[in-house]
């Protein structure tokens, strides 16, 4: 296994707090599954801030940012049954990673955290 990309992002929660009041923003950035999942969260600002940071971190791990027809909604963050966050692999993301790194199989790892004022995310993409 080889690390292909690493990305990290930090965001002030107050920036997301102001933005999530705008439904256009939420619908442009977050998938319908993420929006549905948010309804179960007690801390909406933390929920959206951590996911925003995770999307930015993934784009940085790719090394391309949001280019090549990649947008925020393409990068979907879900949780397993124990609550651990993970990047949901879509066909589009799989194709982008395969093309960018010229690999067939890969894994994505995600760690997210928040504190009162900030949320952060760390992403790793590696070959299998």
Where are these regions (language model features)?
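Core catalytic alpha/beta fold that binds nucleotide/phospho-ligands
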Residues: 1-128
